[in-house]
């Protein structure tokens, strides 16, 4: 109890120095909490923007389809797979798709692109296509409806209600087939790849165009917990009868995002290292100045029989209080900033990752329990570790030299 009282009194013998040191350490902790929240928010933003734009959190395809998108590699009878998906309580939604490269033509121009056949009701649960409609209406289920990107619409010189001819190869005969559609909606994802190269029609119309009645190329999955779909899910559905099925999580679909996530973790480690340097410099400077101011005091208590261990304990308790006070202040400031930007967001402007625009241009920080518990403990522990050397220095003060120096 005596050590605690002495350490607390010694801490405020020079209030200005103590407050400056607290300001340094608490600022470092506040920055660490805010930066960690921003990094977590960036991770969520990147994953959400990629998976909710069009790709989905996971996909089921015929083995080899994703290598070159060969239209002949399709799932002829998805009934068994759909039965398994219906029973899976982890899923929140899924959507069936047909994909094919083809020609997209108007009365004025033509261009190559990707034709997507989708189920409108299912698709709105797994992608942002409905939310991306800038003109007109989303697909309602009528066979001749078509959605086109803004850039492609400008290239073909078409508008709402105009006719579009789609040309694609039949999956069985490889003969070219054509069908006529009308533009019901124009979408804008913000990514040139999507707005210039994709069109969407109803699933049944695409199946008819390609001659694959009942067949599909892709099933897009959405999970209640996105962590479920991080890696490949083959083991989860290994009892499927069709062994030619490939199930891929979002990390397999977008390896570049995985690499970016590793860099964000590295960023947190770098910030933690910088914080360690700041704390070390601040604590060592503060404690050494405090020790030199009390050189006579240490000489006296050593002369009356105080052990080295007791002096070490006194300095470490003082450092603990310094770390505790700094951690409390840094925690309050860091949480206030993180909470504010978790509501209002940090404006990013137009930022693109893997060809996909990140959300609505705002980064929202993410709060987590470990930021409240472990990061302040990390700061207190660093303060104690840094104080070990000054504590040992104080314990080795020779009483006679200390008294002579004081005189």
Question: What is each residue range found by the language model?
Answer:
Residues 288, 297-342, 382:
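Transmembrane alpha-helical interface segments in multi-pass membrane proteins
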Residues 170-268:
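Mechanotransmission and gating elements of multispan inner-membrane complexes involved in transport
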Residues 1-33, 43, 48, 52, ...:
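N-terminal Sec/SRP start-transfer signal
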């Amino acid at each position: 109890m005596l050590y605690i009282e002495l350490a607390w009194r010694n801490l405020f013998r020079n209030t200005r120095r103590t407050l400056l040191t607290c300001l340094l350490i608490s600022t470092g902790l506040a920055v660490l909490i805010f930066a960690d929240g921003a990094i977590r928010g960036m991770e969520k933003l990147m994953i959400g923007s990629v998976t909710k734009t069009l790709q989905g959190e996971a996909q089921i395809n015929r083995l080899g389809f994703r290598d070159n998108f060969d239209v002949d590699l399709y799932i002829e009878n998805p009934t068994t797979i759909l039965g398994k998906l219906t029973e899976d309580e982890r899923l929140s939604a899924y959507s069936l798709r047909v994909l094919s490269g083809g020609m997209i033509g108007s009365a004025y121009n033509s261009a190559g692109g990707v034709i997507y056949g989708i189920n409108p009701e299912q698709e709105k649960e797994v992608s942002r296509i409905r939310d991306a409609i800038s003109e007109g209406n989303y697909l309602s289920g009528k066979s001749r409806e078509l959605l086109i990107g803004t850039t492609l619409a400008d290239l073909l010189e078409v508008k709402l209600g105009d006719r579009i001819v789609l040309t694609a190869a039949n999956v069985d005969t490889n003969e070219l087939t054509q069908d006529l559609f009308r533009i019901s909606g124009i979408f804008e994802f913000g990514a040139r790849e999507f707005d210039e190269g994709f069109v969407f029609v109803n699933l049944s119309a695409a199946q008819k165009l390609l001659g694959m009645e009942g067949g599909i190329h892709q099933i897009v999955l959405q999970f209640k917990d996105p962590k479920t779909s991080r890696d490949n899910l083959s083991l989860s559905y290994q009892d499927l009868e069709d062994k030619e099925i490939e199930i891929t999580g979002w990390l397999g679909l977008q390896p570049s995002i995985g690499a970016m996530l590793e860099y964000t973790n590295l960023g947190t480690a770098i910030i933690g290292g910088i914080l360690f340097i700041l704390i070390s410099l601040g604590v060592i400077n503060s404690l050494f100045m405090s020790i030199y101011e009390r050189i006579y005091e240490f000489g006296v208590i050593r002369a009356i029989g105080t052990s080295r261990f007791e002096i070490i304990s006194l300095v470490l308790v003082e450092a603990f209080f310094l770390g505790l006070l700094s951690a409390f202040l840094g925690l309050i400031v860091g949480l206030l900033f993180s909470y504010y930007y978790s509501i209002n967001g940090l404006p990013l402007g137009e930022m693109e990752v893997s060809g996909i625009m990140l959300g609505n241009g705002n980064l929202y920080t993410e709060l987590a329990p470990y930021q409240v518990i472990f990061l302040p403990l990390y700061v207190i522990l660093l303060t104690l570790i840094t104080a070990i050397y000054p504590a040992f220095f104080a314990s080795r003060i020779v009483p006679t030299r200390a008294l002579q120096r004081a005189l």
